[in-house]
Design a protein with these regions (language model features):
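Conserved phosphate-binding elements of NTP-dependent enzyme cores
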Residues: 1-940
């Protein structure tokens, strides 16, 4: 047995459903905590071990500092020993900031900025010429070489393309002893009172010297160059008098032809989060909000009077329509003319306004005429988008706004200067747009070091970049690019990015706790992930992983299996030990691992109802103009390696098309050519893993709608009728029946000044949320608070004679959620639990049998047994005639599908093709498909 110093010991853990358990986890090992959904895995790993580690860390801060860090409750545990500093890496897309990218999160982009600031070569964004900079000595040598025997003017620029009369400047130059200046290309003698047109842009240079270049006058030439450099702030112009040719020379970066100069580059010049580097148009976001003319004029066949300009609606007697009438009259048309027949110039003025003042008639003032200005429909919409406009106005205007790629930087986020610094003909944005595998290859290629100077500067920076790119490749993220927005990443992707960042940090003696890092990862990349976790372990860290993946469990050093079931029937350690020992035990998990239990392959595949939904020419993101036919009335799985285009095809192309058709959704689908078969569907339902509510007041009862039925039931009780109670009396969200001390929360927040706030049960209602009078109304001896505290399993028996309630909660039980409480806060539900609450809600609804259900990785957070239950639910939906589309990597789900669409062959630019379609038995015959390779073993 290992010594105490080599163990993490947890004594008496009682958080959530944990049954006062003791657990021992070996340090410096890879430990998997597994078990059914709701068995207490996260309660042990995150809410006990991580929470205590975090609390101990915060305890080292001063009381003043702790006050800013929010509430950190002491977990309900007797003692934890052997705990290292803890870092939690959860499967949540935590960063919604549009400025955050894969590159900024991993800090690789910071190294790229440093590389370009130190080794980038500047080019003019006007001529494309390489920018140059000189010392005074280099300029002198260049003059003696290039201009020998020629007459030249040495000029010092003092005004560059600016307005003003410059009377005082000319006087100052004259007082310094200079006789001539060059103004806008012409040499002029300075005379007292001299000035230029103040409203025009001017270029003014001092004529410092004019001479015929000769080695004999080298000293005079040198003195003149230095003087000109001083007067021109590091910039001089040389004019070849005979050829009338001017060249620019500068101590800083400059285009020799145009005189365009750049400041000396620093890392912040390449940051889209810095004013010095960001594109001035989009402020570094890469896209801009613009009024979409197609949304303003959706149908040019109808007239303005009939509502042809969507934001204005049908003709009314108001200022906007009077102004538009005046424009129409000017072009000889009326408001009743179809928009397609109105001259383009008139439409242009209606949309974008006119500089002319319009003569309009005011009907309310006896048709009197007066002149007004007109700014256009688009300007009116933009004004409603302003920060000072009301939320309602902004929402109204938002439906006519489209986010499009910034026309100035083409989505590259940086200004023109930053984009014209290059290494090996690539600018920083082009490198950030490469997928990580391509970028790794580019840096690995010795040709990227184009000059000796760059090679010397770049060596150390390149080493850091390559090591971090390798970590991302190791966790299966080679298809992403550094420019990919963090907000667009899935939970699994963002978790693996943080994992790669942690591996790159080279920390030791840390306890890492991860939540299902294999989510979103194809079987092909699973081994890389396991190796990465072992690398983290081998550098001297302890790694605890909450995981259901079979390969991860068998590759671990130690397994803690929670169970035996979920909710109140879980919370115990049913096994703790090495994987080989676990295979010999008789637990639900071990029986799936050793083959005693398995999810069976269906004996036959459904053919569907003979109808198909066909989408053609899908080309969004990395899709290669693909077409796919989805059989209706079947369970279809969309498969492929990470980044192959699954979500692009279903979530970003197909689903928005259907949502626009059925719900008038404002979200536009990615590009596609055509879709057919949509008439055979009635609706589309997306069942994702986002929370069912974001406040503690939301719960399964409120989400499914059964709480309304329960409140109606209590309203019908004799006591409630006598007192005249309405359903609102039994709501904890409104005044009347709720406890007003805690406002229906059930707890009170105590402010502790500089210490964290503490949440304590309400002293009036003792956590029941309702006042005494409301709790006196009972059904079968139970109050409304008692009902909310029931688990679904208990509630099913309790309401067995109330069909309106039973039908809704019975479905929650059928999807495997019998262990959760009716009134359990939505904030405590896992992603998998939230998804099954949504599924149950859909199952309880009366459907026409023509619904398409779309699920994205529904197995997230699910144990083998949970997956078996989920498959039963999905099959029930299909048996009613509906269509189920699932994006999934889990082979237990894939092998049970009626139809598979496999994308690939790889991720990123190497993906986006449809490799195979058909039944699982047909898919496994494909030689190019990675999915087929692993699926073959499951079908044996």
């Amino acid at each position: 047995m290992a010594s105490e110093t080599e163990l993490i010991n947890v004594y008496g853990a009682r958080v959530h459903n944990l049954k006062n358990i003791d657990v021992t986890i070996p340090r410096d090992s890879l430990t998997v905590i597994t078990g059914l959904s709701g068995s207490g895995k996260s309660s042990l790993a995150f809410d006990t071990i991580f929470a205590e580690g975090q609390r101990r860390y915060i305890e080292t801060f001063s009381a003043y500092a702790r006050g800013f860090l929010g509430k950190l409750e002491r977990p309900d545990v007797d003692k934890i020993t052997g705990l290292s500093p803890v870092i939690s890496i959860e499967q949540k897309t935590t960063n919604k900031n549009p400025r955050s990218t894969v590159g900024t999160t991993t800090e690789i982009y910071d190294f790229l900025r440093l590389l370009f600031a130190r080794a980038g070569e500047a080019y003019s964004y006007i001529t494309g010429e390489k920018m140059v900079k000189y010392t005074d000595e280099q300029i002198l040598e260049l003059i003696l070489e290039k201009y020998i025997g020629k007459k030249i003017y040495i000029l010092a620029p003092v005004v560059r393309n600016r307005k003003g009369h410059y009377k005082e400047l000319f006087e100052q130059i004259r007082k310094k002893g200079y006789l001539n200046v060059r103004v806008d290309g012409d040499i002029r003698e300075i005379i007292p009172g001299m000035k230029v047109d103040r409203y025009k842009n001017h270029n003014i240079e001092i004529l410092v010297d004019k001479l015929v270049v000769s080695n004999k006058f080298a000293d005079k030439l040198k003195a003149s160059v230095r003087t000109a450099m001083k007067q021109g702030s590091g910039l001089i112009l040389l004019q070849d008098v005979e050829a009338d040719e001017v060249r620019h020379y500068s101590r800083s970066l400059m285009c020799p032809t145009t005189g365009l100069s750049y400041s000396e580059p620093a890392p912040h010049n390449f940051s889209f989060n810095s004013p010095q580097g960001a594109c001035p148009r989009c402020k570094g976001l890469g896209d801009v909000d613009q009024v979409d003319i197609e949304k303003i004029i959706p149908n040019p066949d109808i007239s303005i009077s009939a509502g042809g300009i969507a934001p204005l609606g049908k003709e009314k007697s108001n200022m906007l329509f009077w102004q538009i009438t005046a424009i129409c009259e000017k072009y000889g048309v009326t408001l009743k003319t179809p928009i397609k027949d109105i001259p383009e110039e008139a439409i242009e003025e209606i949309l974008y306004g006119t500089n002319e003042r319009l003569k309009i008639k005011n009907e309310s003032l006896g048709n009197s005429n007066y002149m007004v200005s007109y700014e256009g429909v688009t300007k009116y919409i933009e004004m409603q988008q302003d920060d000072e406009a009301s939320a309602t106005a902004q929402k109204w205007a938002g439906q006519y706004i489209t986010t499009s790629v910034c026309p100035e930087c083409n989505g590259q986020r940086l200004n023109k200067e930053a984009l014209h610094f290059k290494i090996n003909e690539k600018n920083i944005a082009e490198l950030a747009d490469m997928d990580i595998q391509t970028l790794f290859d580019w840096f690995s290629d010795s040709e990227t070091e184009v000059t000796e100077k760059q090679r010397l500067i770049a060596t150390e920076i390149k080493k850091e970049i390559l090591s971090r790119l390798q970590f991302l490749l190791d966790v299966g993220l080679g298809y992403l690019s550094l420019s990919r927005a963090s907000a667009s990443l899935s939970g699994g992707e963002s978790q693996r990015i943080r994992l790669a960042t942690q591996i790159g940090s080279q920390l030791v003696n840390v306890l890492y706790i991860l939540d299902e890092p294999s989510i979103g990862l194809h079987q092909r990349d699973n081994r890389k992930l396991i190796d990465s976790l072992k690398k983290l372990r081998d550098t001297g860290n302890s790694v605890v992983v909450v995981e259901h993946d079979k390969d991860m469990m068998l590759a671990s050093d130690y397994i803690v299996d929670m169970g035996p079931f979920a909710g109140r029937k879980g919370g115990e350690v049913v096994f703790a030990g090495v994987p080989d020992e676990m295979l010999k035990r008789n637990t639900l998990t071990s029986n799936y691992l050793n083959g005693k239990l398995e999810i069976a392959v269906p004996k036959k595949r459904r053919k569907g109802n003979g109808k198909h939904l066909i989408i053609e020419g899908a080309s969004g993101n990395n899709l290669k103009n693909v077409s796919v036919s989805l059989p209706l009335g079947t369970f279809t799985c969309i498969t492929g390696v990470s980044g192959s285009g699954k979500s692009t095809l279903i979530n970003e192309t197909l689903q928005p098309i259907l949502s626009q058709k059925f719900y008038r959704s404002l979200k536009d689908p990615l590009p596609y050519e055509s879709i057919s078969g949509i008439e055979d569907l009635d609706k589309v339902v997306s069942v994702d893993q986002s929370p069912i509510g974001r406040t503690p007041r939301s719960n399964p009862a409120t989400y499914t709608g059964v709480f309304s039925d329960i409140r109606t039931l209590f309203t019908g009780m004799p006591e409630a009728k006598i007192r005249g109670y309405k359903p609102g009396r039994f709501s904890f969200n409104v005044k009347g029946g709720r406890c007003e001390t805690c406002k229906g929360n059930g707890y009170k927040t105590i402010e502790m000044n500089f210490l964290p706030d503490v949440m304590v049960p309400c002293e009036s209602c003792h956590g029941k949320r309702y006042n005494r009078e409301t709790l006196e109304v009972r059904f079968k001896g139970k109050s409304i608070a008692d009902v909310l505290d029931m688990t679904i399993n208990v509630a099913v028996d309790f309401f067995e004679n109330v069909p309106s309630i039973l039908n809704k909660i019975k479905v929650l039980q059928e999807v495997g959620l019998g262990y959760i409480k009716l009134g359990q806060s939505s904030t405590t539900l896992s992603g998998g639990e939230s998804q099954r609450v949504k599924l149950a809600t859909e199952l309880a609804r009366t459907d026409t049998g023509n619904t398409m259900y779309v699920l994205d990785e529904p197995t997230t957070g699910l144990h083998f047994e949970d997956i078996r239950v989920l498959l039963g639910v999905l099959n029930k939906l299909v048996e009613k005639g509906n269509t189920v589309i699932v994006i999934e990597h889990n082979l237990d789900i894939i092998k049970c599908a009626d139809h598979i669409v496999d994308l690939g062959p790889d991720g990123g630019e190497k993906g986006g093709y449809i490799l195979a379609t058909g039944t699982p038995e047909e898919i496994v015959k494909n030689k190019e498909s990675y999915t087929a390779l692993y699926l073959r073993e499951e079908l044996v």
